[in-house]
């Protein structure tokens, strides 16, 4: 956990939650999936998990948990697909023809590493709808918001877990208004420090 003034593409945040190990380490990814699956295993039929922001490892474990042999699990014994859209030259999310069939007519769970403003989630939701998928829910490691367009976001961590956490759209950023310079640029890959700052700790 780092505290400071972080700028993402869509928002400014007071903290950066480093979930790198959770996205890339076997044990932590499996644990994350074990928490998230509880929201869906007995209630939602899931055919495909659409992974955003490098969440494919967690998504793979999540698919395995959803499909485990459990007489009460909705997806028991099913083959759950894991796919990731790509950005075309215009910045639009697309699925290539060989992957589109895993979304079209399927019950889809959207998995995102972190949700702050919800804009990335909305773009992914629009992509899923365009390709004919039926969105069954949104799962995230961290989410600053409870819903995206009335779709609940089920997350492991929320702002309540981070004392003093603030997120805002760029024009409304209280840190900018207070004259605090940006410490780092952040995205789904990590963050890049712009200057040394004692507040980042």
Regions found by a protein language model. Give the residues of each.
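Hydrophobic Val/Ile/Leu positions in short beta-strands of Rossmann-like dinucleotide-binding domains
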Residues: 51, 110-111
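PRPP-dependent phosphoribosyltransferase catalytic core
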Residues: 125-201
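Short helix-terminating capping/connector loops at secondary-structure junctions
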Residues: 44, 73-77, 132-134
């Amino acid at each position: 956990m780092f505290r400071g003034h972080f700028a993402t593409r869509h928002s400014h945040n007071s903290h950066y939650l480093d979930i790198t190990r959770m996205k890339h380490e076997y044990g932590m990814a499996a644990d994350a999936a074990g928490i998230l699956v509880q929201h869906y295993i007995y209630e939602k039929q899931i055919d495909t998990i659409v992974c955003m922001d490098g969440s494919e490892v967690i998504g793979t474990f999540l698919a395995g948990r959803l499909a485990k042999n459990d007489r009460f699990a909705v997806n028991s014994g099913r083959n759950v697909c894991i796919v990731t859209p790509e950005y075309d030259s215009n910045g639009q999310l697309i699925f290539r023809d060989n992957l589109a069939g895993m979304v079209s007519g399927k019950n889809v769970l959207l998995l995102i590493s972190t949700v702050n403003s919800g804009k990335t989630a909305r773009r992914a939701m629009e992509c899923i709808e365009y390709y004919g998928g039926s969105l069954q829910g949104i799962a995230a490691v961290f989410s600053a918001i409870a819903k995206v367009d009335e779709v609940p976001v089920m997350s492991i961590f929320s702002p309540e877990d981070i004392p003093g956490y603030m997120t805002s759209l760029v024009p409304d950023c209280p840190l900018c208004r207070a004259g605090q310079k940006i410490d780092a640029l952040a995205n789904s890959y990590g963050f890049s420090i712009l200057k040394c700052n004692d507040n980042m700790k």
